């Protein structure tokens, strides 16, 4: 498999590649992807988890205990649980969103899929995700995997990134353009 050099060069990319290679060796690529998705969703929605992951005040042991408590609740597989514990032990849990995104990209590359990073102010419903996936698939004439993240600062709408292309339909962007137009 051809691995993108830019993904591999980043810290998150290196961790993701290591996890991907082990998952591939054990035949657990999809299982790990599903577990990463569950944890990624929890990470995006739980402010406390993000603070814990990015805060140097808490000891790594406290972070590891929090991960251990989340694993059964989120039904995360053993390989991913060990990986999350490794990230916590190394103080790298704050890089999890980048790692999860890179892992999804490796899976997509393996399957010759396109990955669309979608940023919204609020979580997308399953229906919205499937509608967006269908429209992107129609436009790109390729299978598409959506990497949805939530960023309340965009206020509404969405930003879609596909490789080097970006479509910014966020309210924040529209307000910025309106403000620029009013300045003259």
Swiss-Prot record:
Superkingdom of origin: Bacteria
Primary location class: membrane
Pfam family, one: OSCP
A GO MF term: proton-transporting ATP synthase activity, rotational mechanism
PROSITE patterns xref list: ATPASE_DELTA (PS00389)
InterPro entries, alphabetized: ATP_synth_OSCP/delta_N_sf, ATPase_OSCP/d_CS, ATPase_OSCP/dsu
Alphabetized SUPFAM superfamilies for the sequence: N-terminal domain of the delta subunit of the F1F0-ATP synthase
Record's bilayer topology term: Peripheral membrane protein
Keywords of the record: ATP synthesis, Cell inner membrane, Cell membrane, CF(1), Hydrogen ion transport, Ion transport, Membrane, Transport
Location in the cell: Cell inner membrane
Gene Ontology cellular-component annotations: plasma membrane; proton-transporting ATP synthase complex
Subunit structure: F-type ATPases have 2 components, F(1) - the catalytic core - and F(0) - the membrane proton channel. F(1) has five subunits: alpha(3), beta(3), gamma(1), delta(1), epsilon(1). F(0) has three main subunits: a(1), b(2) and c(10-14). The alpha and beta chains form an alternating ring which encloses part of the gamma chain. F(1) is attached to F(0) by a central stalk formed by the gamma and epsilon chains, while a peripheral stalk is formed by the delta and b chains.
Entry similarity comment: Belongs to the ATPase delta chain family.
PANTHER family noted in UniProt: ATP SYNTHASE DELTA CHAIN
Role played: F(1)F(0) ATP synthase produces ATP from ADP in the presence of a proton or sodium gradient. F-type ATPases consist of two structural domains, F(1) containing the extramembraneous catalytic core and F(0) containing the membrane proton channel, linked together by a central stalk and a peripheral stalk. During catalysis, ATP synthesis in the catalytic domain of F(1) is coupled via a rotary mechanism of the central stalk subunits to proton translocation.
Protein name: ATP synthase subunit delta
Organism lineage string: Bacteria, Pseudomonadati, Pseudomonadota, Alphaproteobacteria, Sphingomonadales
Primary gene name: atpH
